[in-house]
Amino acid sequence: MNSGAPKPPNGPPPMKHARIALAVLLAPIALLGAWTAARDAGGTVRIDGSSTVYPFAEAVAEEFSKKNPGTKVTVGQSGTGGGFKRFGAGETDFSNASRPIKAGEIEACKAKSVEFVELPVAFDGLTIVVNPANDWAKQITVEQLKAIFLSSTAAKRWKDVDPSWPDEPIKVYSPGTDSGTFDYFREVVVGKDGTMRADMSVSEEDNVLVRGVAGERNAIGFFGFAYYTENAKKVRAVPVVNPKTGKAVTPTHDTIEDGSYAPFGRPLFVYVSKAGLAKPSCMAFAQFMLDHAGELAEEVGYVKLPQVLYDRAKANLKALRTGTQMIGPDGKDLHGPIAETYR
C-alpha cells in the first residue's frame, strides 16, 4: 500500500548522514585519545621500601615520568621491613626489597588479601666500609665481623678483633632494623637468632651512614654497593675473605656478578601488588621497569641480572604469577644462585 509519503533519495538516510558526519568529526579526537593513552599511562604509582633499592627505583621513576608525564609516581624509602608493612596494608603498589619477602610478611599480606608478583631486578654487594684513614683492616673475615657486631662478643677496641690492630675504640654504624640490608647482614654474620650489639649508630638513611664512617677514623659500617660506589672517595671498602676459597675479595661489578664476592652478594627485588597491576599506570610502570632494569641498574651502581632472569620476570608479570619463589615448600628460605630458584 502506498501511503503517499515521499521516498527517501538515493544514499543513506538523514540520520545515517548525521552519524557519518559525527564519526568524521570525532575520528581525530579518538585517534588523539588513543595516541595519548599509548604515550602516557596516567594515574598514580606508589612505591616504598628498601633504601638500597631506592636509587634504582628513583632512576626508573625518572625515566618513566619522561615518557608518561601525566602519571604521578612517588618513591619512598622506609626500609624493606617498613615498606612491606605498608605494602601488606594495601597502602602502596610496589615494595622495594633488599632481601626476599619473609613468611610473616606474606601472612600479613594474606590477612589483607594482598596478592603480589615477585620481580628480581639487580644484584647488589653488601659492602663493608671503614674510614680512609684506617690502614690496618686490609681485609676482614666473617668471624672478625661477628666479633665486632655480635652483642655477646662485641669488641670494644680494634685490637680485640686482631692483636695487630690498634688499641683504639671501634665506632659502629649500621642500617636500622627495618632495613633489608640489616636483616641480610645479621643472618650472614650473627645468625637469624643472633643479637646485634646495642651501641651502634643506626639510620635508615644510607647517606647518614656514609657521613658517619667518613667522619670517624675508627668507624666501620655497611650498606649497599651503589652507595659505596657513589661515595668511594669518602669511605674505603674492605675486602671480605670468601669462606669457601679463603681469598679476600673486593666488591666490584665483576666479583658480585660471578659470585666470588661471598657471602655478601645478593639479589634485589621489587614486589608489585596484583591490585596495583589492575591499574594501567602500575602495569605500564612494571613493564617499563623490566624492559630497562639492566641498563638502569648499572647506571646507578648495581649489577644487572642475566637476561634470562628478566625474561622470566616478564613472563611472571604477564601471567600474574603471584607469591614468592624464595621460600621452599617446607617454609624455609631458599639459598643458592637465584637463577636456580627463580623460575
Predicted regions and their residues:
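Flexible loop/hinge segments at secondary-structure junctions
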Residues: 35-343
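Short, low-complexity disordered leader/linker segments with a strong preference
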Residues: 1-44
